[in-house]
């Protein structure tokens, strides 16, 4: 998010004790002014505190609109998944110090519980529909993205889903879907489209895990309706769990986790056999734009402050 302090603020999942605590991630906070130089700010949402367990992916939203009536307009509200013995539940917390630390919201209780102990219900993406006066949640649910609405940010009702099963995609699915994100973008021809980003597995298409997108529109319940088949944002094997920030109606900033669970389950060693203290990193930041090309709308990316020749 872009803070009132003049910085852009980002979070990534950190597990500093991954060898002995393999599932214990928490939110680590960094900030930047130029998207090239980042300042560490420490852990913002710690694991195993305030009633939640490990802290997984989520999103943040500011309260500039005053939607959260019981919070100051300067508050930043985070929604995130926590893995518990009873399932994957969605929690919320708020910050009053530019995202450096967070206080449990809703009394530290889940705002939305997983359907069963073993079901996939995670990675909430939150956005505000000012016209309806609702807060919307996109939630990764196996082979679909569930859509929920709330009038207070605490109680949620199911509105529908974007199905990403084999049947919906013409016979080939994308495996487990994660990290949904929705952006509204004006294309090169002046048309405004909704773009749904998500993480998935392209093994049935001869590819690996990666970040995908579909171009489409929203129905009257804010459920995304695809007008195109999924495409990859990046063809590499190490661009996953992406973060997106809307810079303007034509440009979205994006960066992602440089990692792949196909080889990150164990140690990474150098030529001398020394074990790395880090399993992965964060990619360079890109500017994403939507271009009309060959009768379709496609995402183009170029590195921030980079040479145009590096565009893909």
Spans of features found by a protein language model:
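Catalytic and ligand-binding motifs that coordinate phosphates/metal ions
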Residues: 236-246
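Signature of short aromatic-glycine-proline-rich micro-motifs recurring in repeat-based ectodomains
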Residues: 56-61, 179-182, 241
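Beta-rich carbohydrate-recognition and catalytic domains
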Residues: 1-123, 128-173, 186-235, 258-311
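A short, structured loop/turn motif at beta-sheet edges
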Residues: 187, 246-250
């Amino acid at each position: 998010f872009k803070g009132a302090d003049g910085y852009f603020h980002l979070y990534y999942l950190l597990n500093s004790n991954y060898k002995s605590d393999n599932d214990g991630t928490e939110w680590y906070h960094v900030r930047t002014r130029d998207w090239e130089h980042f300042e560490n700010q420490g852990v913002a949402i710690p694991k195993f505190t305030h009633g939640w367990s490990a802290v997984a992916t989520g999103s943040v939203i500011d309260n500039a609109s005053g939607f959260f009536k019981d919070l100051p307009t300067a508050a930043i509200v985070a929604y995130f998944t926590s893995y518990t013995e009873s399932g994957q539940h969605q929690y919320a917390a708020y910050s009053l110090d530019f995202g450096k630390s967070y206080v449990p919201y809703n009394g530290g209780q889940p705002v939305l519980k997983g359907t069963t102990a073993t079901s996939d219900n995670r990675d909430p993406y939150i956005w505000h529909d000012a016209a309806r006066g609702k807060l919307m949640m996109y939630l990764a649910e196996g082979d679909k993205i569930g859509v929920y609405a709330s009038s207070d940010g605490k109680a949620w009702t199911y509105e529908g889903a974007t199905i990403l099963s084999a049947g919906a995609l013409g016979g080939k699915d994308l495996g487990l879907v994660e990290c949904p994100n929705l952006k509204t973008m004006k294309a090169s021809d002046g048309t405004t489209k909704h773009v749904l980003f998500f993480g998935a597995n392209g093994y049935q298409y001869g590819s690996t895990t990666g970040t995908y997108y579909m171009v489409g529109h929203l129905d009257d319940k804010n459920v995304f309706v695809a007008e195109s088949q999924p495409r990859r944002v990046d063809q590499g094997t190490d661009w996953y769990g992406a973060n997106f920030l809307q810079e303007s109606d034509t440009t979205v900033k994006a960066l992602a986790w440089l990692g792949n669970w196909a080889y990150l389950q164990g140690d990474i060693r150098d030529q001398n056999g020394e074990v790395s203290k880090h399993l992965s990193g964060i990619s360079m930041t890109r500017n994403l734009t939507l271009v009309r090309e060959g009768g379709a709308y496609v995402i183009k990316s170029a590195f921030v402050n980079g040479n145009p020749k590096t565009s893909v």
